[in-house]
């Protein structure tokens, strides 16, 4: 199966379109074409080896934010000071998402409380068939511990590989993830929210920790607690069991869209260039 991180594909398309048009709000028709053409292109490239597309979406609500309220705080804060029309951007993306679910012949998986990361990780841990993850997100490197899992970045147009998956996730947990608002294990929860500097964490210190049980080498109880915080937020094996079960139930019960709807949809949305390649969808 080809597991598509739809949030990344869709956001990359809309940002590229707005950059090209030099406007602060998207042109829905062009964004729609770019997203659909990306799916066509990746399906054509990977179908024969990995099978059909499975479209994985972020829920509007994340379990990680319940556990750690400052999760992805910097992204929310950044949007508040941005000149882009984010209401229109998200409205456009939601419209196209609904159209894709209704009209395209692929399984779409979205589960309340789950991010696409949780969906992709759950399916990778459950199925032994050949799997291609379409995402540039390095969080997925940890899933390459499964020998049947590969990853391709639509951003760099290259395979994502060359890392030891188990070492990578350990280092990632120690360092945290600035883009997701997760401080390193030496730093408190409020580091990014309150504009504090992270406490320095050297490569030498990480190397000294990596082959040990962290409880044996952590300098104090606060750092042990921060380690558990990061482990739960970053290591995808910590997706809650009940959520993983719901993801699997949703995947198994979801039918692919009706391919016969595709032509009428393309005509309705005036996707004439894509109509010529309809057999590739």
Identify the function of each model-found stretch.
Residues 1-98:
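Domain-level signal for Mg2+-assisted phosphodiester chemistry and nucleotide/NA-binding surfaces
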Residues 49-50, 77-265, 269-281:
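Extended two-metal-dependent nuclease catalytic cores across DNA- and RNA-processing enzymes
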């Amino acid at each position: 199966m080809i597991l598509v991180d739809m949030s990344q594909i869709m956001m990359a398309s809309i940002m590229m379109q707005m950059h090209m048009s030099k406007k602060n709000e998207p042109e829905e028709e062009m964004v729609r074409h770019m997203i659909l053409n990306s799916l066509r292109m990746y399906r054509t490239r990977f179908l024969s080896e990995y099978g059909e597309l499975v479209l994985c979406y972020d829920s509007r609500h994340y379990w990680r934010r319940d556990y750690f309220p400052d999760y992805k705080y910097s992204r929310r804060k950044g949007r508040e000071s941005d000149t882009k029309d984010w209401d229109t951007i998200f409205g456009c993306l939601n419209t196209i998402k609904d159209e894709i679910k209704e009209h395209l012949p692929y399984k779409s998986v979205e589960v309340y409380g789950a991010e696409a990361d949780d969906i992709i990780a759950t399916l990778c841990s459950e199925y032994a068939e050949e799997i291609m993850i379409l995402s540039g997100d390095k969080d997925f490197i940890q899933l390459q511990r499964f020998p049947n899992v590969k990853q391709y970045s639509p951003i760099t147009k290259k395979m994502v590989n060359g890392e030891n998956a188990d070492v990578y996730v350990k280092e990632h947990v120690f360092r945290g993830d600035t883009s997701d608002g997760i401080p390193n294990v030496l730093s408190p929860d409020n580091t990014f929210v309150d504009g504090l500097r992270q406490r320095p964490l050297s490569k030498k210190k990480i190397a000294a920790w990596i082959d040990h049980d962290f409880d044996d080498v952590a300098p104090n109880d606060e750092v042990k607690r921060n380690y558990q915080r990061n482990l739960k937020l970053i290591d995808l094996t910590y997706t809650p069991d009940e959520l993983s079960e719901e993801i699997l139930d949703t995947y198994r019960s979801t039918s692919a869209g009706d391919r016969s709807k595709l032509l009428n949809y393309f005509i309705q949305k005036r996707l004439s260039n894509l109509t010529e390649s309809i057999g590739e969808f």
